[in-house]
Amino acid sequence: MKKIIAIVVLLLAAHFVSAKDIEITDVITQDDFKEFTKEFGSALLFSPMAPAEPLGITGFDVSLEMVITDISDDKVFWKNMVDDGDPYSFIPVPRLHVQKGLPFNIDVGAMYVAMPDTNIKLWGLEAKYAILEGSMVTPALSVRASYSKLQGVDDINVDTQSLDVLVSKGFLMFTPYAGASLTKINASENSALVTLDDVSETGYRGLAGLQFSPFPLLIINGEISYGETMQYGLKIGFRF
């Protein structure tokens, strides 16, 4: 348990060192804004970080997550979108994620992000329906819808929606899962430096993950996904 706590602390500490404000500091083009929306919006997506199987009517899942998204930091538009003009090659998003099981194979959840020393705040909601619950011999199959909203950034507004199809199968302490997502990212700007049209970008992502339960109640989850960008996630929490 001490090692697990140490990992969480190190992940969050790495984020604090990397924190930067998002703001438009110089002129960007409409094409730049579209590319920024794709990459930054991908980092804000409410990724599943969980298998397809339902929690059950009494189930809870409370966890800390770190989701890291690669970005094209060598592009000029990124230099004009962070306060110091020196972007990192990734965006780390630490999340508090809570899920609750409901009747009829439905799970609902929420996540919240408040990045210290930055202007970035983020919240999201999700709902998942298990078409197949899964069993000792059959996989679980579910559909999931999610929404996330950026707050705290004066120069831009961003919200995202996604629709996921997930499949998973448990084996002892391990539950591998995979899925595909249809995503939509909406962005607009409020800067005095530019006048740009609103952007709405639709895309697709594939994902794969593995949930590991070394002890009762404790879960460790790793997930990778690929679409406009590569994304890597780690989750540590309690499921009961």
Give names to the regions the model predicted.
Residues 20-135:
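Transmembrane beta-barrel domains of Gram-negative outer membranes and organellar outer membranes
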Residues 51-53, 64, 96-102, 125-129, ...:
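Residues on the lipid-exposed face of transmembrane beta-strands in outer-membrane beta-barrel proteins
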Residues 56, 68, 101-104, 131-137, ...:
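Outer-membrane beta-barrel strand-turn architecture
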Residues 56-58, 89-94, 119-123, 157-161, ...:
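Residues that define the transmembrane beta-barrel architecture of outer-membrane proteins
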Residues 60-64, 108, 125, 139-145, ...:
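Transmembrane beta-strands of outer-membrane beta-barrel proteins
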Residues 66-70, 112-116, 131, 145-151, ...:
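Transmembrane beta-strands of outer-membrane beta-barrel pores
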Residues 74-79, 111, 119-125, 152-159, ...:
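Outer-membrane beta-barrel translocator domains and adjoining extracellular loop/strand segments
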Residues 143-201:
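Outer-membrane beta-barrel translocator/channel fold
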